[in-house]
Every structure is written in structure tokens, then in C-alpha cells.
Swiss-Prot record:
Exhibits a very high intrinsic GTPase hydrolysis rate. Involved in the addition of a carboxymethylaminomethyl (cmnm) group at the wobble position (U34) of certain tRNAs, forming tRNA-cmnm(5)s(2)U34. One of its GO terms (biological process) is tRNA wobble uridine modification. (6S)-5-formyl-5,6,7,8-tetrahydrofolate binds at R25, E87, K130, K464. It is found in: Cytoplasm. Its cofactor is K(+). Keywords: Cytoplasm, GTP-binding, Hydrolase, Magnesium, Metal-binding, Nucleotide-binding, Potassium, tRNA processing. K(+) binds at N236, T255, I257, T260. The keyword Secreted does not apply. This is tRNA modification GTPase MnmE. InterPro entries: G_TrmE, GTP-bd, GTP-bd_TrmE_N, GTPase_MnmE, MnmE_dom2, MnmE_helical, P-loop_NTPase, Small_GTP-bd. Its EC number is 3.6.-.-. Disulfide bonds: none annotated.
């Protein structure tokens, strides 16, 4: 039988492994109360008061105890999924959880109970209007948050902070669309709906608010995704020492022997709640050593994928001809920071410079060995990322949200151009507003393809 969104489903809702408590969750789908009550009786030997915790034995088909724990019954629609839901909270051993799961499947075979797919409980919450799509994604983001700031921002998204901003924008766009449609539908009227309602002013305010939301979303995406920072340069310029200094731990082997690092060493650190994924790589040079050549090829692959490249130089020699060759190969569009290391050997104080000869490049003078200038480098990385220190009310956002917001921004810009041409482009004005609304609705799931839903929820853990 093909799985459908109305099947009764069950899964272990807690993480694998041993713990004090484990949870098995059942959502009854189309089975409703007719399926829920017999299953509760079979598992618990009694009926449960809705939304009350009951301490009961969990029994097998012969009435023998499997475990004792808390059972909670949530009749629809007042549950996580909006369907009738049963949660069994037992002792968190993997064997106990598997026994309870199998017992549920055996007892529910008659009404088609099956194992839940990844993210299926949250998908049903979305389909039953318990959460919009941005809130549903925030559930996974909260679970996967790697920093306190990311967790707090995901919590704000789950609470609807991001969605409320989007809904407000959509309402304003709809109001403006109504004015344009009225002008199109009643051209013979003497009233100029657009002029009377200050349509251009309304559009300008919508664009301003969208720019603000996009700015906050960029901050939220940075909290979620972090920044990939690749350390690149010739051998023995101090890349591994810099990784250790940034991480505050001895992660990479440091020796005076050129070519010590032959494969990447990665570490994620937090700076003001932003995950910085620091990647130390093999030194870039011509070599006959096959293993080292493989490591160098991987270095260039990492550079291609980087958000920022730290090009390390020896401050005693500065930018050499070999360094120029390396810099010429850096991909366009990837920010590069020149890091002049080993200032402890030159006596140059740690500092950040923007030399005219370097164009848009920033130079950071530091000593990875002594730690001088490391905080300056961290601050420069945050500046490049566009992080606004102390930003309040940031909600977590994903790349798809940024794409939709940018597309809406472009449609509104086109609408503004058409608004200036009035009669010649009024139909196009209305169409651009419709397309902008469509992009905004895609964020909250009011206009979203089934394929996209499948991709989003397949990345959830089973049981959530």
C-alpha cells in the first residue's frame, strides 16, 4: 500500500541511544478516535483522560508488562499534528523503545498503522495548519542549532516572528494589487485610484520593509549556515598555527618542516554566535610528492567552495612572486583577506590595514604564535560576513528564503518602473505585484510545490 498523508503513523520521537526517557509517538490520521481508543486500551489496559499525564503499565498482547511510564492522549485538533495523537514516555533504552514501537505496529495493524517517514509528523502539522512552512523548517533548525544564538533565533522563527513579517508584506502587496486591479477594471471612472491612495508611496514603503526583512533574513541565514573560511598559502607560513590560535586548541600539527599538513584539518568555532568553519589546508607549491599533490588539489577544491579565503603570507617577506601566482588563481567573487603572519619575528604591531595598492583587499598583521591580532582577524571575518553585532530579534532563515525574498524584491523594483509609465504598463505593474506575492507566499508555504515539500521534510529526523 502506498503511503499517504492520512495514514496512521508511529515512530520513536527521541534520539537513538540510551537515556532517562524515550518517547514513542503515534498520530492516527484518518483513523481518528476509532483507531486511537482501541490502541490505547491495548497498550495501557485503560482509557486516558485527554491532555492528562497518566502513569500506566505498557503491556504486550498477553497483558505482560513491557515497561511503565507516562501516557498522554491529545485528541484532534489540539495536538502537534492536528490529528489524534498518543505519546508513550518510557525508559530510554533502545530495546525498550523498539519493543514499544513494535507493540504499537502489531496492535495497529488492523487500521493500517505504519512507520513514519522523516519529518512526517511536522509535515502533517503543516498540512493541518498547525504551522506554516517557515515555522515547520524552524523545528528542524532548532534541533540542529549549533550555537546558542542560532537556537534562540530558531525559537523566534518557530514562534512565528519571521512568518508575521512575511504575512504583513503579503497583506500590503494584496492591498496595492486591489488598487491596481480597480484602476484596470474601471478605466471610465473619474477617480484615479492609484493617485487617490498614493500607490507609489505604498509601493515604496513595501520595498523599504522588504529590504529590512531581507537584511534580518541574511543575519539569520548566517547564524544557521555560518561561514566557511579556508586558510591558504605557501608551506610554512603558519596556517596550522593560525588554525590552532583561532580554535584555542592544538588541532593541527605544527613543525618547521614544509609540507607537514597534507590533508585538510577543519574546526568550527563560534564568534558572537556565528559558526566559523575554519579549514587548514596543504601548503600550495610545486612538488613531486604524489601524496602532497593530492592534498594541494584538495586545497584548491576547498578554496572554490569557500565563503572567505585567508591568504597567509610570511610578514618577513611580504607578497612574493610565488604568492602572486597563488593569488591570481583565487576564484573571483570570493572575499580574500591577506594575513601577514609572524609579526613576532619582525616587530610589526598587530593591525588591520586597507592599503591602496591592494584594492578591496584587507591586510591583517598578526602573530599566530603569540596570539597578537587574532581578535582583529575574527572581527574582520564578521565584517566580511555582514554580521551586525548585537542585532535583536533576528530569526533563522534558509537559503530558499533569501532566494524568494530577493526575487520578490526584483519584482517590486520592476513594478516601480511600470508604475512610472502608468497607462502603458498598468497590466505589467499588476503582474509584477502578483509575482512578488507568489514569491513571498512560497516562504510560508501558501504557494509551494509538492516536490519542494518532499525535499524539506525528508531532511527532518524520523519521529519529528
Amino acid at each position: 500500500m502506498l503511503a499517504t498523508d492520512s495514514d496512521p503513523i508511529v515512530a520513536i520521537a527521541t534520539a537513538a541511544g540510551r537515556g532517562g526517557i524515550g518517547v514513542v509517538r503515534v498520530s492516527f490520521g484518518r483513523g481518528g478516535e476509532a483507531a486511537a481508543l482501541p490502541l490505547i486500551d491495548a497498550l495501557c489496559g485503560q482509557q486516558l483522560a485527554p491532555r492528562h499525564a497518566s502513569y500506566v503499565p505498557f503491556v504486550d498482547e498477553h497483558g505482560a508488562p513491557l515497561d511503565r511510564g507516562i501516557a498522554l492522549y491529545f485528541p484532534a485538533p489540539h495536538s502537534y499534528t492536528g490529528e489524534h495523537v498518543l505519546e508513550l514516555q518510557g525508559h530510554g533504552g533502545p530495546i525498550v523503545m523498539q519493543l514499544l514501537l513494535q507493540r504499537c505496529l502489531d496492535a495497529g495493524r488492523g487500521f493500517g498503522l505504519r512507520l513514519a517517514q522523516p519529518g512526517e509528523f511536522t509535515r502533517r502539522a503543516f498540512l493541518n495548519d498547525k504551522l506554516d512552512l517557515a515555522q515547520a523548517e524552524a523545528v528542524a533548525d532548532l534541533i540542529e542549532a549549533s550555537t546558542e544564538a542560532a537556537a534562540r533565533s530558531a525559537g523566534r522563527s518557530l514562534d512565528g516572528a519571521f512568518s508575521r513579517q512575511i504575512h504583513a508584506l503579503v497583506e500590503d502587496v494584496i492591498t496595492l494589487r486591489m488598487l491596481v486591479e480597480a484602476t484596470l477594471d474601471f478605466p471610465e471612472e473619474e477617480i484615479d485610484f492609484l493617485e487617490a491612495a498614493d500607490a507609489r508611496g505604498k509601493l515604496a514603503r513595501i520595498r523599504e520593509q522588504l529590504a529590512h526583512v531581507l537584511g534580518d533574513a541574511r543575519q539569520g541565514a548566517l547564524l544557521r549556515e555560518g561561514l566557511s573560511v579556508v586558510l591558504a598559502g605557501q608551506p610554512n607560513v603558519g596556517k596550522s598555527s593560525l588554525l590552532n590560535a583561532l580554535a584555542g586548541a592544538e588541532l593541527a600539527i605544527v613543525t618547521p618542516i614544509a609540507g607537514t599538513t597534507r590533508d585538510k584539518v577543519a574546526q568550527t568555532i563560534q564568534v558572537e554566535g556565528i559558526p566559523l568553519h575554519i579549514i587548514d589546508t596543504a601548503g600550495l607549491r610545486e612538488t613531486e610528492d604524489e601524496v602532497e599533490r593530492i592534498g594541494i588539489a584538495r586545497t584548491w577544491s576547498e578554496i572554490e567552495r569557500a565563503d572567505v579565503v585567508l591568504h597567509l603570507l610570511d610578514s618577513r617577506t611580504g607578497m612574493t612572486a610565488d604568492d602572486e601566482v597563488i593569488a591570481a588563481r583565487f576564484p573571483g567573487g570570493v572575499p580574500v583577506v591577506r594575513v601577514l603572519n609572524k609579526t613576532d619575528l619582525t616587530g610589526v604591531p598587530a593591525c588591520v590595514e586597507h592599503p591602496a595598492a591592494a584594492g578591496d583587499l584587507t591586510e591583517v598583521h598578526l602573530s599566530a604564535k603569540r596570539g597578537d591580532g587574532i581578535d582583529m582577524l575574527r572581527a574582520e571575518l564578521l565584517r566580511i560576513a555582514g554580521w551586525q553585532a548585537g542585532a535583536e530579534g533576528v530569526y533563522l532563515a534558509r537559503e530558499r528564503h533569501l532566494i524568494a525574498l530577493r526575487a520578490a524584491q526584483e519584482h517590486l523594483a520592476q513594478a516601480a518602473d511600470h508604475a512610472e509609465q502608468r497607462a502603458q504598463s498598468l497590466d505589467l505593474f499588476a503582474e509584477e505585484l502578483r509575482l512578488a506575492q507568489e514569491q513571498l507566499n512560497a516562504i510560508t508555504g501558501e504557494f509551494t510545490s509538492d516536490d519542494l515539500l518532499g525535499v524539506i521534510f525528508s531532511r527532518f529526523c524520523i519521529g519529528k
